Amino acid sequence: MFKLERKDYKKVINLVKSQDELSVFSVINGENPGTIYANNIINPTAALIKTSECNLIAGNPNDEVFNSQVSEELDFWDQLVPDSLEWMDKIPTIHKNNFIRKYKRRHYVLSNDNFVDYTDPLKIGYILEKVNISFLKESSLENSEIILEVLSENWGSEEIFKKHGTGYLVRNDKIIVSWVLSDCSFEKTIAIGIHTDKRYRRNGFGKIAASATVKDCFAKGYKKIDWLCVDSNKGSIAIAEKLGFKLINLYYSFTSYPPIENLKDLSESEWYQWGEYLEEASKTEECLLLECIYAYIKSNDVEKTINIMTNIKQKNIELDYLTFKNWIINLQSYDMCSNFTKKAWINFLNENIPNVD
């Protein structure tokens, strides 16, 4: 496996057959930061492309020497996108986590003709602003550091973001409550992503910021806008479709942990399925035990949670029960974990936390 120099990135472009992950083409074209590994410098036939948005593996899936070296460049927790169906069965055999699990993603596209502007007014006390990196660096606004980190990872520099990207945010005096940023661009297509502080959701802030960002993307000359999200993210799907985005493809990625973008993206039964999967996988990969507990807690299953915690205790692995208690209390504020008020859980905590309330 060889780490390509930037001047050689375009040698792998014909290996990429899928069109879902725009960041892959942004990196190949030199517009966004990223790293590319290939099985040959002169004439590559297999490649691992790492971007700020994804890791994608493409080309010939049968180069066993290349495949054996892929795990050296991926962390246990890294997600991995197969470029073709031929890679689907290969990924669990070449990833550090042999139990990595596939999940479904959505690819939406918007053209100017289909755009539906969102014109509802902002609530009193909130303002809409174009993202200004210099202003954010000098401000003390809550969430500004998160935005700056994302922009740095995606674009590398303020100058490149100004040239190719855009974004809008909604804020009050002290807090940025929602923001939509362009993640990457390639030729006449740009991809955008949305985030709203969980304390301020269901207020229309995301739609307002997204609508403004879309208009600015078209004003900059882009012809199409990409919107990618997990298949379970109902909120993101609703906003995209309200603005006129059209679903053009469903595709798969692989993950070591539940692929959620919001706490309630998965139902209790879906969380339970993840708990079962992680419980079985943890017999080989012990580091998945904590993820297993988190999944069973979110599935609202007290008995399974206690059983797993008891098994961990018997292995002489320490757990911070007070942290779990406080985390569950926080989840209950989102109408989750209602069963964790039952006597069985309270008694279990009493046994493991001195003087627990």
Language model features by range: what are they?
Residues 1-21, 115-155, 266-283:
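Short amphipathic alpha-helix that is part of the acyltransferase structural core
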Residues 33-34, 38-138, 254, 315:
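Acyl-donor-binding surface of acyltransferase catalytic domains
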Residues 63-69, 192, 202-217, 238, ...:
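Conserved acetyl-CoA-binding loop-helix of GNAT-fold acetyltransferases
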Residues 75-85, 217-229:
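Conserved GNAT acetyl-CoA-binding A-motif
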Residues 87-98, 207, 231-249:
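Conserved active-site alpha-helix within GNAT-family acetyltransferase domains
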Residues 101-111, 244-261, 320:
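Conserved catalytic-core motifs of GNAT/GCN5-like acyltransferases
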Residues 153-198:
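A conserved beta-strand-loop-helix scaffold within acyl/acetyltransferase catalytic domains
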Residues 268, 301-304, 329-356:
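Alpha-helical linker/edge segments of TPR/alpha-solenoid repeat scaffolds
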